[in-house]
Amino acid sequence: FRGASRWLRAYDGKMGMNRRQLCQAIRRSPGRYSAIGAKLGGLDSAVAHVDSIFARFHAIYPQGRQPGVYFVVGAGMAAGTTTHTSDPVVLIGVERAGDPSRLASTVAHEFVHTQQDYPWVGIFTGGPSFLRGTLLRQSIMEGSANLIAELVTGVPSRNEYAEAHEAELWADFSREMHGKDYSRWLWNGGNPKRGDRPADLGYWIGYRITKSYYDRAADKTRAIHDILTIRDFDRFLTASGYSPPLHAPGAR
């Protein structure tokens, strides 16, 4: 990594990636990396959308800050992430970048993370338990990013499985939401604990809670401010008025 850019090094530090892991990823999925060249034209058009994403966010939340966005080649660990600094940036793993419309949603989601101002204690997802946030906090953090990305891009956040099983999911989630085990709900694509359910259903629960709060608010700009500056996640859940439907949409 002698010639690595500052932002590739930042990505490496955040994801814990090293040269060996990158080489292994290329050997494991050569097609993914050989396709990067063909994606560059699409990335050029996606980059052209970045400023419009910021402009639309600024329109609904004028006090938002515009971070830098950088594309790097990673080891396939994440489509996007942000740096944990006082002046955070968005880092996009180009090897996992899909079509331009999906990429716009990824950029918008990560952009929202750079705007979130939550209590420092609980910000981490690993390490000592006292530093980690509850499942409720982390799910709202991810779900609110999906909601605001939806507002900015116009691309709906859909999950057919979750929509059909929302009441069941909420019953299970609410029993675990004050714990710090994320394995059944978040960042669990390769975790057998999720069973036969799709991965990352905590994103959906957090999205539904946040959407309920936003939809009930008369002042939408204030609602976005509230969502980005939550201090008490249990209180926010109560204020959202979230209550899952007893039946899936269209069910009788």
Predicted regions and their residues:
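N-terminal mature-domain "stem" immediately C-terminal to a signal peptide or N-terminal signal-anchor/transmembrane
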Residues: 1-28
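Acidic helix-start/capping segments at beta-turn-to-alpha-helix junctions
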Residues: 1-7, 69-79, 229-233
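Residue-level recognition of alpha-helix termini/interfacial anchor residues
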Residues: 1-7, 11, 33, 161-176
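Structured segments of extracytoplasmic/periplasmic soluble domains
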Residues: 3-4, 56-64, 114, 118, ...
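Residues in flexible loops and secondary-structure boundaries
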Residues: 9, 77, 100, 148, ...
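Acidic/His-rich structured neighborhood in mature extracellular/periplasmic domains
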Residues: 18-162
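Pan-zinc metallopeptidase signature
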Residues: 162, 170-252
